[in-house]
Design a protein with these regions (language model features):
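A short helix-coil junction within the Rossmann-fold of NAD(P)-dependent oxidoreductases
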Residues: 23-32
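Active-site loop immediately N-terminal to the catalytic Tyr-X3-Lys motif
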Residues: 2, 46-53
Length: 241
C-alpha cells in the first residue's frame, strides 16, 4: 500500500467515526442522554496480515471509544458509549474494496449475514453494554490474543493469506471505492450467501444474560451433586473393601 492509501483508510474508517461521534455528542450532551454505538471488529483486538490499515483504524476507534467513555463517566453524563465487535460479514465490501491480491478477496470464515450484525447493533443501542462481541469466532480471536499472542502470530502467518482469498483471479482494473463511492445500490449482501450463517448462538447467549447465568448455576449444581455422589461412593468402597 502507498502512504496516501493508508491516509485515506485512516480518514474514512477512524476519523469518520470520530467526527460522527463528536457531531452526535453536541446534541446528546445538551440533553444529557443518548447512546452512541461504535461498530468495531474482532480486528480491533487482533490485527491480521493484508489488512494493516483497516486493523489499525479499528484499534484506534477502540482507543478513542475507551477514552471517551471514561470522560463521560467523569462528567457524570448519562450519555453512554458502546462498541459492537463484529465477525466476518457477507457484505458487498469485498466486491468493491481496493485489492492487490492475486485471487478475489473474501472475509475470513466463518462468515455471517449482515442481519446478524444489525440485530446486535439494535440490541446494543437499547441496552448499552460496555461492549458486545458477535460470533464465537470473535470471542475466540479476542481471548486467544489475550492469552497467547505469539501463537496467534504463528497461526495467522500460516493461514491468513489463503483464508482471505477464494477461487477466481482478481480483476486488477475493476473499480473500487477507495477515493470515491461507486454508483448504484449494491444491497446489503455480498456474494457469499451460500456460505454465510444467518444466526449466532453465541450472540443469543450474550443478549440473554439471565439464561446464561441460569444455565451456569444449573451446571454448577449438577457438578456439585455428581461430585458429592462420587465421593460417597468412594467412601463406601473404602469402608467395605
Amino acid at each position: 500500500m502507498a502512504a496516501e492509501e493508508y491516509q485515506r483508510v485512516t480518514e474514512v474508517t477512524y476519523l469518520g467515526a470520530v467526527y460522527g461521534t463528536l457531531s452526535a455528542l453536541r446534541r446528546m450532551r445538551e440533553r444529557d442522554q443518548g447512546v452512541i454505538v461504535q461498530v468495531g471488529s474482532a480486528l480491533a483486538y487482533r490485527s491480521i496480515p493484508l489488512q494493516s490499515a483497516y486493523c489499525a483504524a479499528k484499534q484506534a476507534m477502540r482507543g478513542f471509544t475507551e477514552s471517551l467513555r471514561t470522560e463521560l463517566i467523569h462528567e457524570r453524563s448519562r450519555v453512554r458509549v458502546t462498541m459492537v465487535h463484529l465477525p466476518a460479514l457477507n457484505t458487498p465490501q469485498f466486491g468493491w474494496v481496493r485489492s492487490r491480491l492475486p485471487r478475489k478477496a473474501q472475509p475470513v470464515p466463518p462468515i455471517f449475514q449482515p442481519e446478524v450484525a444489525a440485530q446486535a447493533i439494535v440490541w446494543a443501542m437499547e441496552h448499552a453494554p460496555r461492549e458486545l462481541h458477535v460470533g464465537a469466532s470473535t470471542d475466540a480471536a479476542i481471548l486467544t490474543q489475550k492469552i497467547a499472542p505469539g501463537l496467534m502470530d504463528e497461526y495467522l502467518a500460516r493461514s491468513a493469506w489463503d483464508a482471505q482469498m477464494h477461487d477466481g483471479p482478481e480483476d486488477p482494473d475493476r473499480d473500487d471505492n477507495l477515493w470515491r463511492p461507486l454508483s448504484g445500490d449494491r444491497g446489503a449482501h455480498g456474494s457469499f450467501d451460500q456460505r454465510a450463517r444467518d444466526r449466532s448462538p453465541q450472540l443469543w447467549l450474550a443478549t440473554h444474560p439471565a439464561v446464561f447465568r441460569g444455565a451456569a448455576i444449573a451446571l454448577g449444581v449438577a457438578a456439585g451433586i455428581w461430585s458429592a455422589r462420587r465421593g460417597r461412593a468412594q467412601t463406601r468402597r473404602i469402608a467395605f473393601p
